[in-house]
Structures are given as C-alpha cells and as structure tokens.
Regions:
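Eukaryotic intrinsically disordered, low-complexity regions enriched in proline/serine/threonine/glycine
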Residues: 15-17
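Intrinsically disordered, low-complexity polar regions and short flexible loop motifs
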Residues: 12
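All-alpha RGS (Regulator of G-protein Signaling) helical domain and cognate RGS-like helical scaffolds
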Residues: 2-9, 21-25, 31-196
Length: 196
C-alpha cells in the first residue's frame, strides 16, 4: 500500500492541485469545454496559458485512465468492482476527449499520453497487492482531480462557466464517494471536505 498521495504526484500536478501555479482557465476556455464554440470565439484574447492549464488537466485524466487500466489488468479486482472501475475509466476517457477537442479548438497541441509502463512506475503499481490497494490508489487520484477542478471555480465570474467546472468536479466526487464506500470508509467527519 502506498503511504501518501504526495508520493504519486509529479511537480506540475502538485502545483496545479495546490493552487501554487497561480493560473486559471479563461472564460473562453471553459466555454469551449462546454461546447459553446461560437460564444468562446467572440470573447477573443490569448489562450496560450489556458492551453497549458488544460494540458495539465489532460495529464490528470491520462493518469486516471491508466490507473484504472492497471487495476483492471492486475487481476486483483473482483467482478462487480471491476465493472465499476471500467465505468469510471470510461468517464475519464470522456473527460480526456473533451479536453483534447478544446485544446485543439484553441489552436493548441494536446499533451501526449505516456506508455502504460510509465504510469505503472509513477503510480507504483508493483506495490498493489489487493483489491483494497487498487481502490485506495483510485480514491486518492479521484480526490486530487476533484480538488483540481474545484480550484478553477473561484476564478470564474460567470455562473454558467462555473457550472461546467462544477460538473467535472461532481463527476470526480461521485467516483471518490463510491470508491470510499467500497473500501468501507466512513464519510468525512468535517463539513466542506472538498476543495481545501
């Protein structure tokens, strides 16, 4: 079992999750993510910084996709849990596809996915010895993604734009909740446990 989530987080991800990167998505980038292309184009403005932020988010989605793949291939997941893991992997593939399309619409180049073996090393897949280990890893990645998406909401001035970021965070929160339930963990004892 891996002791801390910080062991899994690469420096760029750590900055993105902690908010120390001091960057936020523009309204145009969030509109593109929401499929509002014409409205986004009318806003104009430079989007290079947004492409960088979206590429960090894309990297997080690649990591989640590959973590679920490693879990599925491990032989450690029992049938009902394996089905849920495959479903969650599909959700992350949907997030990936939306991010790639948005980055390309912005004229950017999406960061490329690494090889599965690279993710296995970063995520220390060789330490996964049980279904609980796989679920624990996935839960830690899901809470990291939740907090990352929640981190962009305060920078948005428009309620509709904040809604898009909140929907992504809600997806990740749902995954985290299901995984924690499967691990028979209690609900958080404090109010407002997400986004801190």
């Amino acid at each position: 079992m891996i002791d801390t989530a910080s062991e899994l987080i690469v420096p760029a991800r750590r900055a993105f999750l902690s908010g120390t990167s001091k960057v936020a998505l523009s309204a145009a980038a969030v509109l593109l993510l929401a499929g509002k292309d014409s409205l986004a184009q009318s806003m104009g403005g430079p989007m290079a910084a947004d492409v960088g932020i979206l590429n960090v988010a894309l990297g997080l989605e690649y990591e989640a996709i590959n973590a679920y793949q490693l879990g599925a291939q491990s032989g450690l997941l029992q049938k009902p849990v394996l089905d849920v893991a495959v479903k969650f992997q599909g959700d992350h593939k949907g997030h990936r596809d939306a991010l790639i399309a948005t980055i390309e619409k912005m004229g950017g180049k999406p960061v490329e996915e690494k090889k599965l073996d690279d993710y296995a090393k970063v995520l220390k897949a060789d330490t996964l010895k049980s279904q609980a280990d796989v679920l624990d890893l996935a839960a830690r990645l899901e809470i990291g993604a939740t907090n990352a998406y929640l981190g962009v909401i305060p920078t948005l001035k428009d309620a509709q734009l904040a809604k898009v970021a909140a929907r992504l965070a809600a997806d990740e929160t749902m995954h985290w909740t299901v995984l924690n339930s499967a691990l028979s963990r209690s609900l958080p004892s404090d109010a407002l446990p997400f986004g801190a």
